[in-house]
Regions:
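Residue-level recognition of single "structural anchor" positions
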Residues: 1-199
């Protein structure tokens, strides 16, 4: 799935339509696997990122309209979990945090106000880095891991020269799966996955 459907069709002699069908089914299996996440425990980094066409002049970050917002949780030096969200409000982000992170975890975020009140809901070990004040790391207080994942994801998805919004979720989950298995033999991992859940 490193090639576009057109390139794969050209290499194999199979129609683009058939290749697309196979790719979609594979990505659906991968997405199901990615959604079977246990609650994260340990040192966790949280951040949001915006995916979509190049920015419109003057619009950046949280004000960028028309972009897909993705919220990410990364267990430091291990796995990432991503979720497409409608907004970056406190209610949205904290709902996901409560459902995916154990209370005694150490949480690191940037200074976004959507994270206000995490201590009030039981996350006592909560630390921030304030990017607005040019603070990016203070010892173990940083979100460099999740920001590294965003760079990896954007670079990987860029090679497709645009992804249909309806298909973005599946491509995102494939990227998440690849990142989480970056030290493994991806081919063997996919074979195990398909043995367990055939197409």
């Amino acid at each position: 799935m490193d090639f576009t459907a057109s390139d794969t069709a050209r290499l194999t002699g199979i129609s683009v339509r058939s290749i697309n069908t196979i790719y979609i089914k594979l990505r659906q299996k991968i997405a199901i696997q990615c959604e079977e996440v246990s609650p994260f425990h340990g040192v966790i980094e949280l951040d949001e990122s915006y995916f979509g066409a190049h920015r419109v002049r003057g619009k950046r970050g949280r004000g960028a309209s028309g972009k897909t917002i993705v919220f990410g949780l990364l267990k430091r030096n291990e796995n990432v979990y991503t979720e497409i969200v409608p907004d970056c409000s406190k209610a949205t982000l904290q709902g996901i945090i409560r459902g995916h992170i154990e209370l005694d975890s150490v949480i690191n975020t940037d200074g976004w106000r959507g994270y206000d009140g995490l201590v009030d809901i039981g996350f006592d070990k909560y630390f921030r880095v304030n990017h607005g004040n040019n603070e990016f790391a203070c010892g173990e207080r940083h979100i460099n891991g999740i920001e590294s994942f965003w760079g990896y994801a954007k670079k990987r998805l860029m090679k497709f020269n645009g992804i249909d919004k309806k298909m973005f979720y599946l491509h995102l989950k494939e990227t998440e799966y690849r990142f989480n298995h970056r030290h493994d033999n991806l081919y063997l991992d996919l074979l195990k996955l398909l043995r367990k859940n055939p197409l």
